């Protein structure tokens, strides 16, 4: 059984604690603290390890620092996953961003040192002085280009080319739905929708062509039933079409933090960075595991080809 208990401040209705339990065992307790004008100052999460962030803001109430730490006194492994916004543009857009995490040698340190340039409010280019991580499963920014203009848009403001991700062209249908992504290596991802704009099929054309079909709440991979989606999670099917149920436990933002299968086994837990990216996937057995279907705020995490907003 899954249980999510939230406690709110009776004066300002801000969340104070959230307790996630599965199989009658408490798996996570998150506590939130605020300053006198209700700005979030810290989030601390218990589980295998107590971990959390402390936040600092500038005079315009914009986030400047998010300092990560672990342990009862929040003094261990300090800055392992910290994020710092060093400057904003006059329009309020991020100009300099630093992220910390696991480096290629296994140590923790600076993994992203990003500088953003804009044309109005549209990102024109991003450079990374920290370089790219090489290990599988890394979530740093991949600086795949070194040009004055790396992002291109159409007249409607939709992205049509991304040099950093090797995307040479993005096509949209007349309703503005994503139709085809073409990569510089010739690979393509194509999408088909019904008249109402609901996605019916995704086709990944690479060395091998794979299809994903969506029929109501059913998902088929290469013609075989793979998942059935329902409000609190999904049901997966193995090669013999035997079902296994998986249940979501979400945080106060609606992001999936815990997945529990029908046997009460904890599946991957998700840890999101402060500036909108996944910083790690972990399980309660400290194993590296494959990510599930849905990510932050229930958006798709496409495992074959992914476009991530920075």
Listing of model-derived features with the role each one plays in the protein:
Residues 1, 7, 16-17, 31-33, ...:
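Residue-level markers of secondary-structure register and packing in elongated scaffolds
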Residues 1-3, 7-9, 86-124, 214-223:
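Structured, non-catalytic alpha/beta "coupling" segments that mediate domain-domain communication
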Residues 21, 32, 110-153:
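Extracellular/periplasmic ectodomains of large secreted or surface enzymes and adhesion receptors
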Residues 23, 47-49, 101-103:
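Short glycine/acidic-enriched loop and turn motifs that connect beta-strands
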Residues 25-27, 143-146, 240-243:
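Active-site-adjacent structural elements in folded domains
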Residues 72-76, 104-106, 133-142, 291-293:
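Intrinsically disordered, low-complexity Ser/Thr- and acidic-rich flexible linkers and loops
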Residues 189, 225-227:
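Short, isolated positions in well-ordered beta-strands
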């Amino acid at each position: 059984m899954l249980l999510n208990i939230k406690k709110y401040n009776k004066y300002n209705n801000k969340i104070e604690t959230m307790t996630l339990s599965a199989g009658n065992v408490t798996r996570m307790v998150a506590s939130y603290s605020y300053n006198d004008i209700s700005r979030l100052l810290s989030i601390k999460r218990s589980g295998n390890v107590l971990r959390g962030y402390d936040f600092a803001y500038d005079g315009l109430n914009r986030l400047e620092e998010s300092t990560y730490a672990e342990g009862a006194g929040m003094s261990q492994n300090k800055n392992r996953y910290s994020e710092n916004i060093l400057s904003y543009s006059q329009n309020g857009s991020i100009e300099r961003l630093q992220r910390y995490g696991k480096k290629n040698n296994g140590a923790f340190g600076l993994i992203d040192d990003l500088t953003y340039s804009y044309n109005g409010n549209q990102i024109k280019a991003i450079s990374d002085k920290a370089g790219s991580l090489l290990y599988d499963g890394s979530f740093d920014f991949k600086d795949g280009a070194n040009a004055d203009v790396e992002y291109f848009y159409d007249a409607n403001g939709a992205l049509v080319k991304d040099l950093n991700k090797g995307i040479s062209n993005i096509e949209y249908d007349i309703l503005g739905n994503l139709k085809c992504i073409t990569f510089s290596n010739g690979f393509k991802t194509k999408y088909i929708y019904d008249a109402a704009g609901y996605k019916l099929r995704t086709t990944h054309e690479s060395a091998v062509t794979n299809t994903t079909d969506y029929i109501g709440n059913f998902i088929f991979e290469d013609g075989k039933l793979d998942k059935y989606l329902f409000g609190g999670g999904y049901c997966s099917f193995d090669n013999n079409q035997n079902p296994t149920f998986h249940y979501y436990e979400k945080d106060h933002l609606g992001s999936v933090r815990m997945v529990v299968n029908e046997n009460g086994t904890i599946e991957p837990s998700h840890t999101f960075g402060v500036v909108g990216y996944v910083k790690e996937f972990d399980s309660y057995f400290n194993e590296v595991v494959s990510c599930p279907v849905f990510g932050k705020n229930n958006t798709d995490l496409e495992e074959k080809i992914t476009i991530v907003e920075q």
